[in-house]
A protein has these predicted regions:
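Conserved beta-strand hairpin/beta-sheet module of binuclear metal-dependent hydrolase folds
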Residues: 5-54, 185-200
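Structural signal for conserved beta-strand scaffold positions within catalytic alpha/beta enzyme cores
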Residues: 11, 18, 64, 82-83, ...
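Accessory terminal helices/loops
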Residues: 1, 135-137, 202, 218-308
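Active-site HxH/HxHxD metal-binding segment of metal-dependent hydrolases
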Residues: 45-164, 201, 247, 251-266
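Metallo-beta-lactamase
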Residues: 35-36, 43-44, 145-148, 154-155, ...
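Residues that act as N-cap/strand-start positions at coil-to-secondary-structure junctions
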Residues: 3-4, 13, 22-24, 149-151, ...
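Short, solvent-exposed secondary-structure boundary motifs
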Residues: 1, 17-21, 143-147
Length: 308
């Protein structure tokens, strides 16, 4: 595989930069006149702070979308770290080593499959571009010694908090479901919605031990009803996509609603760790639920298509 930098950086709009670790995860640097927010710090495999320093000299506050290791791996490089109040404790706890081992195993399989994918794309489809290609690990990184250092948050965030960066304000929206501490950040002036793992153009992991399917349905419905008209672009964190149209919010909310009401078809899926999950497939995404989870026929009907 060709040698390329671990991180891909791209200016998405005025004062907003993508810092991607393709195809693993996206982080976003958001600049105001006097301060900056780094929304997630990625895997902790490369030095994301060095990348940030090349883009800005403003004081940086890390805001974790949630506590998972693929979003907080670079926290150790920063002093100012904020997370929703319900994520403070798990952020400070050790990441189970088996999670990291399983992720490395998945990464190896993914790299092998990508070679086939790239060959097919070059022959037939022509959809990939160089920014999507997986990178080799940095020379200083030893996969066998990969560890995500627990970090202590310097600030606990709450629903409705506003982060004033100077001529840019980011509103904290608590969106539990994937994890209890999931948040989104909304810049009402530009219409940018940074969604972490609340919205994903791929599998939504609602089957994990601290996931809550009903909470995910409520959170996505809330985004689609209370905030939809304020959104011009959605910035997600996974699956080789870093910008989505606002209608995607509605699609996901309607998908969760259809699933809960028993109006969606289900099959068997497997997550990146090889664990079984119930899988619901939709046009631009899927939803994983615990194998024993069942729809609730008494759930209230209604879709955002009507509400809009």
């Amino acid at each position: 595989m060709e040698s390329r930098p671990w991180f891909v950086t791209k200016q998405l709009e005025d004062g907003v930069y993508l810092i991607s670790e393709p195809p693993h995860v996206n982080s976003f640097l958001i600049l105001g006149d006097h301060d900056a927010v780094l929304f997630d710090t990625g895997m902790g495999i490369g030095n994301i702070k060095a990348v940030v320093s090349e883009l800005t000299d403003r004081e940086v506050l890390v805001v974790n979308s949630h506590y998972h290791f693929d979003h907080s791996g670079g926290n150790k490089l920063f002093e100012r770290i904020a997370i929703h109040e319900s994520g403070v404790k798990p952020l400070s706890e050790d990441v189970p080593p088996e999670w990291l081992t399983a992720y490395m195993d998945f990464s190896e399989r993914m790299l092998e499959k990508f070679k086939i994918y790239r060959e097919l794309d070059e022959a037939y489809f022509h959809l990939l571009h160089v920014d999507m290609f997986p990178r080799p690990f940095p020379s200083e990184f030893d996969p066998s010694k990969w560890a995500v250092v627990p970090t202590v948050a310097s600030r606990a965030l709450h629903e409705g908090d506003v982060l004033d960066l100077g001529r840019r304000a980011l509103e904290v929206i608590h969106t539990p479901g994937h994890t209890p501490d999931c948040i989104c950040l909304l810049d009402r002036r530009s219409g940018a919605l940074f969604v972490g793992d609340t919205l994903c153009a791929g599998p939504h992991y609602s089957h994990l031990p601290d996931s809550d399917v009903d909470a995910s349905a409520i959170s996505t419905r809330r985004l689609a009803t209370e905030f939809y008209r304020d959104v011009n672009v959605v910035y997600p964190c996974h699956i080789l996509r870093y910008a989505l149209d606002p209608k995607f919010i509605v699609e996901v909310a309607d998908g969760f609603q259809a699933m809960i009401e028993g109006r969606a078809e289900r099959d068997l899926g497997h997550d990146i760790f090889g664990e079984d999950a119930g899988r619901y497939r939709f046009n631009r995404f899927s939803i994983f639920v615990p194998p024993a989870w069942q729809p609730d026929a008494s759930a209230p009907a209604g879709t955002t298509e009507a509400e809009r």
